[in-house]
């Protein structure tokens, strides 16, 4: 496969995938929660992820043609598949049972702490991927994704501090 190089468009596609995985994770967690407060919080977190996906879609539309860099040589789409696999495994794993992380009846603070950890994982993921996006293919745009994730942590932390 050789060394992996990504463009900003591919990273935005994966950012949206992570948000969709988050929606599925929190929706499933809501179904499994025994108490109403926990269910409500999971639904709110899923809704936040949906808004985030829309933000990334909007940001992606503003990418330049170079940031789409469709001329990268990757006939089997190996690089993008690698990127998707990493996102699925290390941020929100769509196959993971939320109850392995969240116990039924978990208090809202514990639930929010788990959500904050997921957001931190996404920041680490994007910071690592940024090194594989050449500047001409939009590496600086990855900072915009990280900024959005940091903003999400701030919102979740404020929410947690209120409970």
Where in the sequence are the language-model features?
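Non-heme di-metal
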Residues: 1-163
